């Protein structure tokens, strides 16, 4: 219930935002996608508007999180589990050893990520990155992908790695497993979920034509 409340609340959030000389109600998914806008001033305004929007509903979102975590802790206690990570491990169909190996690999990679962000800051003329610069695009491009172009790009590159994976991605597109449209009332972000009854997956994304969203779509198909 608390998870559904969080999803319903965040999907209805919108802010008045000026873009291209025109002020409109912008849903949160579209606002979040401005993190990769080529103009720094637009990225910063989007970041600040996003924070203001979250601030307005922070008490409800905190209550949702406490409700979800409280339920998990109660169930773990009843089941005699040591900590709250077990529910997430079970949901992901993995064991603790695999999780620890993944976390260790991530920690080992921290210096590489730090080096990348320092170099990115240098390339855009800064000593260090502001939060609104983390997803800033590198270089300049006017390319905007249609959904069909994104599909062809993903399937083609999946095929280079594995024809089986490419065929699977094509099946997902052909059978409309993907809800990619940005619209009012839709939750932000992207995710993939399995549908056990039909042994298929369904994917949510908020596709805006950017390469970042093409990459996100490919990422979620990897989960499928």
Descriptions of predicted regions:
Residues 1-97, 101, 105-108, 156-157, ...:
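His/Asp/Glu-rich acidic catalytic environments and adjacent acidic regulatory segments
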Residues 18-23, 74, 120-138, 171-182:
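A glycine-rich phosphate-binding loop feature that marks nucleotide/adenosyl-phosphate handling sites
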Residues 46, 53-54, 58-62, 205-206, ...:
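Structured ligand/cofactor/substrate-binding pocket environments in proteins
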Residues 78-84, 126-131, 193-197:
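Flexible hinge/switch segments at interdomain interfaces of large molecular machines
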Residues 85, 91-164:
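A metal-dependent hydrolase signature that marks the N-terminal structural subdomain at the beginning
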Residues 142-147, 153, 160, 196-218:
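Short pre-active-site segment immediately N-terminal to the catalytic Zn-binding motif
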Residues 143-145, 178-200:
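Catalytic zinc-binding patch centered on the HExxH motif and its immediate surroundings
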Residues 222-224:
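Catalytic Zn2+-binding segment of zinc metalloproteases
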């Amino acid at each position: 219930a608390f998870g559904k409340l969080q999803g319903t609340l965040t999907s209805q959030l919108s802010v008045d935002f000026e873009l291209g000389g025109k002020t409109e109600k912008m849903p949160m998914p579209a606002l979040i996608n401005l993190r990769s806008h080529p103009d720094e001033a637009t990225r910063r305004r989007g970041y600040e508007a996003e924070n203001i929007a979250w601030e307005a509903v922070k008490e409800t979102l905190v209550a949702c999180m406490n409700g979800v975590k409280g339920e998990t802790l109660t169930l773990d206690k009843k089941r005699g589990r040591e900590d709250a990570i077990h529910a997430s491990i079970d949901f992901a169909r993995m064991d603790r050893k695999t999780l620890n190996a993944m976390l260790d690999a991530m920690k080992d990679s921290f210096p590489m990520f730090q080096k990348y962000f320092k170099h990115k800051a240098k390339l855009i003329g800064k000593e260090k990155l502001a939060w609104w610069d983390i997803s800033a695009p590198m270089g300049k491009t006017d390319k905007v992908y249609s959904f069909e172009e994104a599909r062809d790009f993903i399937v083609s590159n999946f095929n280079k790695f594995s024809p089986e994976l490419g065929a699977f991605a094509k099946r997902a597109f052909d059978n409309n497993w993907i809800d990619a449209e940005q619209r009012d009332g839709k939750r932000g972000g992207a995710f993939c979920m399995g549908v056990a009854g039909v042994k298929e997956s369904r994917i949510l994304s908020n596709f805006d034509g950017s390469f970042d969203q093409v990459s996100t779509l490919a990422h979620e198909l990897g989960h499928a």
